[in-house]
């Protein structure tokens, strides 16, 4: 299961199920007023319930199609920011984030921290970019529910995102090499 993308070097990956859940940080933030100062327990609970329902439905479909995943890799702003917040990274250091692990308990602790702060106070949290403060609580809720519903107690965080993986795949195919994943992009000139 993944929030973002996944790329493992040196291994052939057989991608036999892909699903995008139509729920992101911004939508959850807006629906449950999570960028407000001290969001209500009702709104936080509602966000958890909505995320859990949508994640669990996708996970059931995935389980019907393929074997259980062995590793959860998180990429992008939420996952990398969680490491930066936990480790008080100021300034941000990608080398200290890449391939670092975070537990579900730590994600839940950071969620509590974010929920207890005003938006201005969230902007001042060490390790969190101010521009991410309005959506970080929602991202943390989404990631926590993905971890809970897929049975993962830990997450590996990668600085290499989905775009990086797509570039590697397209470059390999363009060079006539085997794709690092079992998926062959169709490369054609842009007109």
Predicted features and spans:
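Helical "lid/coupling" subdomains associated with nucleotide-phosphate turnover
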Residues: 3-191
């Amino acid at each position: 299961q993944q929030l973002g993308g996944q790329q493992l070097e040196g291994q052939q990956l057989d991608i036999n199920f892909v699903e995008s859940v139509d729920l992101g940080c911004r939508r959850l933030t807006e629906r449950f007023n999570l960028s407000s100062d001290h969001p209500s327990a009702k709104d936080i609970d509602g966000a958890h319930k909505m995320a859990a329902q949508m994640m669990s439905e996708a996970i059931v479909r995935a389980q019907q199609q393929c074997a259980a995943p062995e590793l959860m890799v998180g990429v992008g702003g939420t996952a990398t920011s969680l490491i930066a917040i936990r480790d008080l990274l100021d300034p941000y250091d990608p080398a200290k984030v890449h391939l670092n692990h975070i537990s579900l308990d730590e994600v839940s602790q950071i969620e509590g921290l974010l929920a207890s702060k005003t938006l201005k106070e969230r902007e001042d949290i060490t390790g969190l970019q101010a521009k991410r403060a309005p959506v970080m609580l929602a991202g943390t809720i989404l990631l926590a529910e993905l971890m809970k519903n897929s049975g993962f107690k830990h997450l590996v965080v990668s600085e290499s995102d989905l775009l990086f993986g797509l570039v590697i795949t397209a470059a390999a195919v363009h060079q006539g090499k085997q794709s690092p994943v079992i998926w062959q992009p169709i490369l054609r000139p842009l007109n």
